[in-house]
Every structure is written in C-alpha cells, then in structure tokens.
C-alpha cells in the first residue's frame, strides 16, 4: 500500500507543479500520518461506545464498533514482562520493565491488562533434546504440569518462554516453541492455573491505599504503578513475590511499525520502489485507510513546500469525500 500512497501523493503534487517530496521526507510524513490515523481509532471507539449507550448506533453492516475493534485488536499483543534484574529475583521485588522495543520488541501505546502468575512449580535442567520438547529424565511432570503452564529456558540468552501444549509422559512436555535446542539448559515451570489480575493505580494513590489494611493491595487483589520504564506491583510481601520472567504477562496495544518506502537509485538519479530492501515496512493500517493516509500526507507536504493550497485541498477532501467518524459527530 505504501507505494500506491506515495504515487498518488506525487501525482497530486505534480499536477500543478507544486514541487517534489524526497523519499526521506515522505517517510517522515507517512510515519506521522499513520500515527494520527491510529490514534483516531481509539477516540472513535469511545464515540461508538457512547453512541451504543445512547441507543443511537447501528447493527449488522452498520455496526461501527465491530469494524473499529477488529482494527484495534490487530495491534493488541500479549508479552511476558522482563524482570528488573534477571539474575537476582530478590532485587527485582515485583519490579518489571514495561513493554518497549528493547524489552518486548514493541513500543506500548496503552496497557490493557496485567496478569500475575505467582506460583513456580519446579525447576531443573534438561538432559535430552527434540523439537518443541522439554525432556528431563529426572522429572515427574504427570500430575504436576498442566496444559497452559509456562516453561522458561533460563540458560538461553536472552531467556526464552514457551507454553505447555501437552504432558506427553512423566519426563517429556510438548511446547509451543522450540526453546531447548541443546542439553544442559536450566529451566523452571510456572503454573498458569493460579493467576490474578492486577489493577493499575496512580503513584499518589498507592501511598494512601497502603495506609489502610482494608484498602491495601493483597495477593488476591494486587495493584501496580508505572513510570516511564518500570512497573511496580503490590503488595510487596513474602506471600506475593514476583521476580521471574514468565510471572507477569501484559496485554497492551502496540504502536504501529514505522512505514518506510525503500528504493534503489537509477543511473539518472531517480528512485525506484524496491520492497526487497531489509528495512522496507508497509503501512499497518487496513486498506480502507489509504485515502485518509494520502490526505494527511498531502497536508504535511503542503506545509513543507509552503503551498497552503495543497494543505487546504487535502483537508477539504478528507472532510468531504471520506469523513471520519469523529467528523460526522
């Protein structure tokens, strides 16, 4: 879609000889346009919910909630959070890094849910290998490990996680990922049968909550606060100790990946689209947003080349030809 968007943008600009937008400028404008369109989904979702509550929304093909939710859920991911200190769980003391490019591979836009798994079932070392298997001839997995439990290869760098699909026998588990390619790796297993959801509170509120035994977070009703990089879970006690990878799972909406129009340069100096480049990245928004992306990019182009007519044209087209839900309200 990104090449189609760029070709349309250049066609509109060239029609009246407004100027040329370089690939680097286009990529910058494309990033901002996608972020704008992405954030509009959340504000539009709020308006749709309000319309449903007021009984003014449609159904079947007019069900805007369904269409918006499907697009939003494409960006909803689940990741185990990285503990503050891998090697010293006691130092971690319920502190985990929030999702980011360096810890989970995705930048978090909004955290939706935090689930804690406080119970560690067992730990040992594998002494056999097979694809998607954990083999430990000293183990007794039957009656202890259940489907859905979390297995962590602690010796891998970085540590890797997998979910138990099935207990094959007393010494062998079928896993969701092939995380034991060699023998001699240390592992542990966390129970997914015992879990509790944590509620977010503000840093100021947690102080007042902890002052009362009635309102203080407990192992049955935990809470968490967060800053720019870390999440702190409460209560901090011997009955609720979290410090291992696999003990805290976060469902969050990630930011879309930065779009990048990649190219090769011909002898005459003209850039030609080449999606085989390793840093190529298409837009992640659905095809129906192509028009919106074009109009938003044209607005940035108008500012860049100091042609107010381009920006005004794009704004008018966005409002008239394909109004967003927010503009209809």
Locate predicted features.
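Autoprocessing Asn-cyclization modules and mimics
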Residues: 117-183
């Amino acid at each position: 879609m990104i090449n189609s968007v760029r070709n349309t943008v250049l066609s509109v600009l060239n029609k009246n000889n407004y100027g040329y937008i370089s690939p680097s400028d286009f990529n910058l404008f494309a990033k901002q346009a996608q972020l704008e369109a992405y954030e509009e989904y959340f504000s539009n979702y709020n308006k749709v919910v309000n319309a449903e509550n007021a009984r003014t929304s449609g159904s079947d093909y007019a069900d805007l909630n369904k269409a918006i939710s499907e697009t939003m859920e494409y960006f909803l991911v689940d990741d185990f959070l990285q503990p503050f200190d891998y090697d010293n769980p006691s130092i971690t003391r319920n502190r985990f890094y929030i999702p980011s490019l360096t810890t989970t591979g995705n930048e978090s836009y909004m955290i939706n849910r935090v689930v804690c798994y406080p119970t560690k079932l067992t730990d040992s070392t594998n002494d056999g290998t097979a694809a998607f298997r954990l083999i430990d001839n000293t183990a007794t997995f039957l009656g202890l490990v259940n489907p859905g439990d979390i297995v962590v290869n602690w010796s891998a760098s970085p540590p890797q996680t997998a979910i138990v699909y099935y207990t094959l026998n007393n010494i062998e588990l079928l896993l969701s990922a092939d995380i034991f390619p060699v023998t001699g790796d240390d592992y542990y297993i966390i129970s997914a049968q015992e879990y509790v959801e944590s509620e977010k509170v503000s840093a100021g509120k947690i102080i007042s909550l902890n002052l009362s035994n009635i309102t203080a977070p407990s192992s049955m009703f935990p809470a968490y606060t967060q800053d720019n990089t870390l999440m702190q879970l409460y209560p901090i006690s011997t009955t609720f100790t979290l410090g291992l990878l696999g003990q805290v799972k976060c469902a969050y909406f990630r930011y879309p990946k930065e779009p990048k129009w990649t190219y090769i340069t011909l002898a005459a100096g003209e850039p030609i689209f080449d999606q085989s480049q390793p840093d190529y990245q298409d837009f992640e928004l659905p095809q129906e947003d192509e028009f919106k992306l074009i109009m938003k990019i044209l607005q940035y182009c108008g500012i860049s080349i100091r042609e107010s007519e381009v920006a005004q044209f794009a704004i008018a087209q966005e409002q008239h030809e394909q109004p967003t839900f927010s503009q209809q309200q």
